[in-house]
């Protein structure tokens, strides 16, 4: 059965593209999985621009019902083991049109889970709650992006009723590692994939290798 991982967060500025890129790297390299990337952030397609030469990538705008129908066709046709969707900031469209896609997952021979990339603000939880309430059968993994502070500082999440509900529904939580700003800046400017970090200065290289190894340990079990 195909695995769909929808990298979401409901808003901009939580690090969705960074998490999606790390997940794509683990899926295509250490996990060795046949992967399809859906770039739904069509206004700022950084992930597609970085990875389209290394992995099959399709740009689909999910602002309309037609976009979700196109997504369904792409998933139905693909022979990929895993489909990774990089959602835009405006991904509340899942609440409006996502049912036509999610209700037909069995016919696509696919199962879906959501990786909800969050900062420490309350609206990250509120947006996640809206998705969980709309689609209770879709497991959600709450991804604490430690760029915004270590996991202990995600107190709103830790003390929330939503956390208990997510775990009861078969979801989970992950702590995504932070990487030095200078490394991320260099990689973004040069559009480097994680398997191309050898071109970085030595100090940046060893930091990128640390980050990549931590993401491997984090995401390999998640992809199983």
Predicted regions and their residues:
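Extreme N-terminal, non-catalytic leader segments
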Residues: 1-6, 73
């Amino acid at each position: 059965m195909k695995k769909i991982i929808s990298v979401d967060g409901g808003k901009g500025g939580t690090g969705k593209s960074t998490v999606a890129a790390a997940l794509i790297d683990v899926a295509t390299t250490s996990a060795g999985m046949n992967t399809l990337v859906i770039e739904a952030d069509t206004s700022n397609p950084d992930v597609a621009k970085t990875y389209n030469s290394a992995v099959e990538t399709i740009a689909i705008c999910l602002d309309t019902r037609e976009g979700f129908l196109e997504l369904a066709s792409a998933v139905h046709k693909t022979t990929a083991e895993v489909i990774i969707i990089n959602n835009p900031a405006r991904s509340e469209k899942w609440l409006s049109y996502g049912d036509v896609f999610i209700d037909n997952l069995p016919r696509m021979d696919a199962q879906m889970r959501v990786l909800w990339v969050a900062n420490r603000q309350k609206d990250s939880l509120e947006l996640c709650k809206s998705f969980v309430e709309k689609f209770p059968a879709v497991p959600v993994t709450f991804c604490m992006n430690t760029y915004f502070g270590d996991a202990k500082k995600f107190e709103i999440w830790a003390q929330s009723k939503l956390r208990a509900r997510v775990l009861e529904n078969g979801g989970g939580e992950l702590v995504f590692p932070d990487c030095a700003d200078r490394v991320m800046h260099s990689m973004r400017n040069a559009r480097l994939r994680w398997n191309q970090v050898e071109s970085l200065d030595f100090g940046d290289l060893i930091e990128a290798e640390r980050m990549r190894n931590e993401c491997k340990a984090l995401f390999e079990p998640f992809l199983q």
